[in-house]
Amino acid sequence: MTTQLDSLRNMTVVVADTGDIEAIKKYQPEDATTNPSLILSASALPQYASLIDEAIAYAKSKSNCSKQQLIDAEDKLAVNIGLEILKIVPGRISTEVDARLSYDTQATIEKAKKLIALYNEAGISNDRILIKIASTWQGIRAAEELEKQGINCNLTLLFSEAQARACAEAGVYLISPFVGRILDWYKANSDKKDYAPAEDPGVISVTKIYNYYKQHGYNTIVMGASFRNVGEITELAGCDRLTIAPALLKELQENNAPLERKLSYTGEVKAKPQPLTEAEFYWQHNSDAMAVEKLADGIRKFAADQEKLEAMLLTKF
């Protein structure tokens, strides 16, 4: 019997949104994505204790400065978890830059290069890694430079059409437009609490971005992310990639209902517009209250989890 997960795989690259090795083994995704929150939860799993110990030992060998040791340990732990995942997935791992660098182009570039160097030292080539960066103007500029240097990027926390357009114009490899967090905002800020999948504002956002990219011939991959229910996923069947948490992969695997392709583009390709200026980007992005609030909120939450991870690591030194 064909499951919905099998059907989805025939039209979309399925990615696992988790740092849990056992879940990745079970659902056999092409790629996997991590973020500071997922690294924090994964680091609490007993099978990862040795990865933490190794990261601490590495940090101690690199510096005598306690502040630098902590930075080195958290970077090495993220890469160690990525290395374990790469033993299972045939494709790429996404590893995220510290969210506290989201408004600093140069610091983001330097952190990305450090993460890449750690992977390279472990024998992993650049074509198996995506560096995740928040889709701020500064993050997009960092990604533009990194792409020129052969480091592919995954631009995350993407909520507005302005962010999506700026990413494509910068030539980034992949974007992760969020679905569920958009739905969360509309539920919290309107009287409407129930949305059918086709009218889900997060689904509508990703569909618009997908169609815009295809209409204008942009090569940037669209990978829908942050799902609250299976309906959001099935409504985006056909998207280039979808990154899905294990609980929702399980639901898809247990459902044998037919799955219809929802996203595809067969029309002619239009000319690309002139790239957005910084002023135009900020005007358009800031015209969308949801996008402004969710980008800032997402950065704050990832930064908070990075700090919790640091607090945990400090107890290990």
From Swiss-Prot:
Q: Which GO terms describe its biological process?
A: carbohydrate metabolic process; pentose-phosphate shunt
Q: What is its EC number?
A: 2.2.1.2
Major localization class? cytoplasm
The active-site annotation reads K132
Which reaction(s) does its UniProt entry say it catalyses?
A: D-sedoheptulose 7-phosphate + D-glyceraldehyde 3-phosphate = D-erythrose 4-phosphate + beta-D-fructose 6-phosphate
Protein keywords: Cytoplasm, Pentose shunt, Schiff base, Transferase
Q: Which cysteines in this chain are paired by disulphide bridges? A: none
Q: Which Pfam families match?
A: TAL_FSA (PF00923)
Residues of the signal sequence? none
Q: Which PANTHER family match?
A: TRANSALDOLASE
The text of the family note is: Belongs to the transaldolase family. Type 1 subfamily.
* NCBIfam families, per the entry: PRK12346.1, talAB
Query: How does this polypeptide assemble, per the annotation?
Result: Homodimer.
What job does the chain carry out? Answer: Transaldolase is important for the balance of metabolites in the pentose-phosphate pathway.
Q: What's the protein here called?
A: Transaldolase A
Q: Which organism is it from?
A: Pasteurella multocida (strain Pm70)
